[in-house]
Amino acid sequence: MQRLTVDEFHEAKKLPLIVVLDDVRSLHNVGSVFRSSDAFRVEAVYLCGITATPPHPEIHKTALGGEDSVDWRYFPTTTEAVAELQKEGVFVYSIEQVEGSTKLQNLSLDTDRRYAVVFGNEVKGVHQEVVDLADGCLEIPQFGTKHSLNVSVTAGIVIWEVAKQFIAGSNTEF
């Protein structure tokens, strides 16, 4: 399989998805999210609050250069990022276990829209004010003894589900 160069990646058509990290504290998780975002040609990653930003050797260790290929922005607060996205017409989902959330397997996307998905802090999840601002909430059903997944694992699962729907809806690779 032929891989894109970083320059080719920047010019390539992107998955119309922005990944938002809400106070994610682990540099490993930030790097892993960049790596998954690169794999599926995500439009951008928004890093908010205490979330670390590149360049950083610990991010690079897991991102393997994904922090160079995927566009990213920093926002002091996640509410600022969400407000800007919504102003641009982006539909924002918080990834959180809340009453009335949509199970990921029931997600049905309009492939003519842009979306954002907000992933929260490893301990506290997505801030409540961000959940309240979001246009919807998604959750990954879980059937074991634990009630959460690692944030980078969750991001990979959600990004793949969004990518699958766009691939199926367009009969192309974005």
Protein language model features and the residues they cover:
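Post-transcriptional modification and biogenesis factors for structured RNAs
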Residues: M1-F174
